[in-house]
Amino acid sequence: MAADTPGKPSASPMAGAPASASRTPDKPRSAAEHRKSSKPVMEKRRRARINESLAQLKTLILDALRKESSRHSKLEKADILEMTVRHLRSLRRVQVTAALSADPAVLGKYRAGFHECLAEVNRFLAGCEGVPADVRSRLLGHLAACLRQLGPSRRPASLSPAAPAEAPAPEVYAGRPLLPSLGGPFPLLAPPLLPGLTRALPAAPRAGPQGPGGPWRPWLR
């Protein structure tokens, strides 16, 4: 009878295979998916940094302006930034005034540099064919007016009398004054709409000898 009794079926080596094969490993996330998942965390950190910096800026600006923090406890972010901008502009004006008081030649150097930039703009516009004459005249007139607002360049008293002036005396060409260029290849022709630059000056010849090379160019003398 024992021989007729069927025994337990032996465990097949492939019995557990389907269960393990059905479990696929997780696919690695792409860089875009990683950025998308981490974006909220990064945004939270960014906002925390901004708020922390604004809090420190508020403390600094109130201390600099000598204002009580208790009276300005509910300042908005825009108010903090505007107060900071106004304070920095005020500091810049103070620094410029202090620099001029310490060295009067600073304004002359700044004016000379502005004059050189004006001359460079004039040279650039002279080589641009598409710039209308009225646009060029208005631009040069505006820059010359800005140069006039800087005030006349004064030689510091510490310089010896033999030291050369910062700019040569103006000349006249074709009835219109020339703005001297400090080291530039040619001076600037002052626009006629600037009455402050058209003061009486010694007359200069309107025409000169023309050689085979072309018309007379007074700025190449």
UniProtKB/Swiss-Prot annotation:
Residues 110-143 form the Orange domain. It comes from Homo sapiens (Human). Residues 34-91 form the bHLH domain. Transcriptional repressor. Binds DNA on N-box motifs: 5'-CACNAG-3'. One of its GO terms (molecular function) is protein dimerization activity. A motif (WRPW motif) lies at residues 216-219. This is Transcription factor HES-4. GO terms for biological process: cell differentiation; nervous system development. It comes from the Eukaryota.
